[in-house]
Design a protein with these regions (language model features):
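Catalytic cores of nucleic-acid ligases and guanylyltransferases
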Residues: 1-204
C-alpha cells in the first residue's frame, strides 16, 4: 500500500541499556502518547501515525493550532499527548476517545519548512528553528523541551517522577527514517506505559 503524499517515515530511537553520559547529547522526556507526523500546507493539515495511517480527524485542537501557524508549510514530528488533571500523561484517554479536543502535540523535530528539507541539518539547528516556528503558537502545540545534562541523572529524575523514560539524541544527528543509533530510548521499567509498549509497540 503506497504511503500518503507528504508523509515522512519517522526516525525511531534504538533501545539503550543505559542512558548515554557525556557531552553532545540532548535528553527529552519520553511522552506516553501517539507518535505523529504533522503536515501543514497553507491552511490544510494532515496528521499521520507512525506507519502512515490518517489521524487527522482524531485531534481537532492540534489540527486547528497547526493551521494557524505563520509558516506557509511545514512537516513536524512529535507526540500527541493527553494529560490528566494532575498533569501526568494518560494513554488510555488518548487511545479510547475517538475525537478528543484536549490532546496536545509535543513537537520535538522539524523535518521541512516552507519547502526546504531540513533533514540534513543538525538536530540542535532543527530544534532551534522549530522553537522559532512555535513561538506564540496556538494552545494545541507545545515545544518539547530538552535538557543538556548527564543522561543517567536525567533518567533517574524522570523515573522518580513516574514518567515513561527519556529519549537521548546526538546534537549533531541528521534526521533519517527508521531506527537510528543517534537516538536512544531509556525506559522506566516500573512504568505501566513501558510494559504496554513492549507488548503493543505503541509510540516511539
Amino acid at each position: 500500500m503506497p504511503l500518503p503524499r507528504g508523509f515522512v517515515q519517522p526516525c525511531l530511537p534504538t533501545k539503550a541499556l543505559e542512558p548515554p553520559s557525556g557531552e553532545g547529547w540532548l535528553h527529552e522526556i519520553k511522552h506516553d502518547g501517539f507518535r505523529v507526523i504533522a503536515r501543514k500546507d497553507g491552511k490544510r493539515v494532515w496528521l499521520y501515525s507512525r506507519p502512515g495511517n490518517d489521524l487527522t480527524y482524531r485531534f481537532p485542537l492540534i489540527v486547528e493550532s497547526l493551521a494557524k501557524l505563520r509558516s506557509r508549510s511545514c512537516i513536524i514530528d512529535g507526540e500527541a499527548v493527553a494529560c490528566e488533571g494532575n498533569g501526568m500523561p494518560s494513554f488510555d484517554r488518548i487511545r479510547y476517545r475517538r475525537h478528543d479536543a484536549s490532546v496536545f502535540l509535543y513537537a520535538f523535530d522539524l523535518i521541512e519548512l516552507n519547502g526546504d528539507d531540513l533533514r540534513r541539518e543538525a538536530l540542535d539547528t532543527r530544534k532551534a528553528t522549530l522553537a522559532s516556528v512555535l513561538r506564540r503558537a496556538a494552545p494545541g502545540l507545545r515545544f518539547n523541551e530538552h535538557i543538556e545534562a548527564d543522561g543517567p541523572t536525567v533518567f533517574a529524575h524522570a523515573c522518580k517522577m513516574g514518567l515513561e523514560g527519556i529519549v537521548s539524541k546526538r546534537k549533531t544527528s541528521t534526521y533519517r527514517s527508521g531506527r537510528s543509533p543517534d537516538w536512544l530510548k531509556s525506559k522506566n521499567p516500573a512504568c505501566e506505559a513501558v510494559r504496554r509498549e513492549e507488548e503493543e509497540d505503541w509510540g516511539r
